[in-house]
Regions:
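Short, solvent-exposed micro-motifs at the edges of structured domains
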Residues: 1-227
Length: 227
């Protein structure tokens, strides 16, 4: 078994050379780069990862049912393994769907990468979050035309990530050099919903809502002939 825990804090004024969806193309105000200082887009404060491989103690050469009977042959060679990952969410920035500061850099031609931010008053965080209302949308307002919003960069946290992947393997020796392996693999074993970032564009009909999630549970089976 292996386990690791990471606590981190990363701060910058630009996390990517090329923008991706939800990331700014340019600073909101090129003459005030200090206002861009905030948590990095990739900053994950806490991450715990545990992995294991365990040979089941049944069958020939094992603690239990080690004779040459039918049960021994059936239960010999089983192995289970898995990876458990728990982490907090990464930060995101609330942005405007339309440019109001007349700087000409508010939104990209592709419709994402908005770098104009709204005004914020009060606490935008919520004590009880849900996919329908991930943060306090009432805390954000449009700034007056011709001015920059006072909301900071990456001031909110997105959903965390909780995932368990596991496998069950049966190895059967066919000869001294040949082995038949059956595999059952489970991705997101408990079908835990891992949500994507909420809609962060003020003015969008779904502003503040989580509208998509990562992959649900997948199960796959396979047979390998190893020689």
């Amino acid at each position: 078994m292996l386990a690791s825990y990471t606590w981190s804090k990363s701060i910058d004024d630009a996390s990517n050379f090329f923008p991706s969806a939800g990331d700014p193309n340019y600073p909101q105000n090129s003459y005030d780069l200090r206002s861009e200082r905030g948590r990095s887009n990739f900053d994950v404060a806490h991450r715990l990862s545990v992995s294991y491989v365990y040979d089941l103690p049944f069958g020939k050469g094992r603690t239990y049912l080690g004779d040459d009977g039918a049960w021994s042959k059936l239960l010999t060679g089983w192995q289970t393994s898995g990876i458990v990952t728990l982490q907090t969410g990464r930060p995101f920035t609330v942005a405007l769907l339309r440019e109001l500061d007349n700087s000409g850099t508010g939104i990209s031609a592709l419709g994402f990468g908005a770098n104009d931010r709204p005004n914020v008053a009060g606490d935008p965080s919520l004590g009880q979050r849900s996919p329908e209302r991930w943060f306090n949308t009432a805390a954000f307002t449009f700034p007056p035309r011709g001015s920059f919003g006072n909301a900071g960069r990456n001031i909110l946290d997105g959903p965390g990530y909780h995932n368990v992947n596991a496998s069950l393997v049966k190895n059967t020796a066919l000869s001294e050099t040949m082995n038949l392996q059956f595999r059952a693999e489970f991705f997101n074993l408990f079908n835990h919903p891992n949500f994507n970032l909420p809609d962060n564009f003020l003015g969008s009909p779904s502003f503040g809502q989580v509208t998509s999630a990562r992959e649900p549970r997948h199960i796959q089976f396979g047979v390998k002939l190893l020689f």
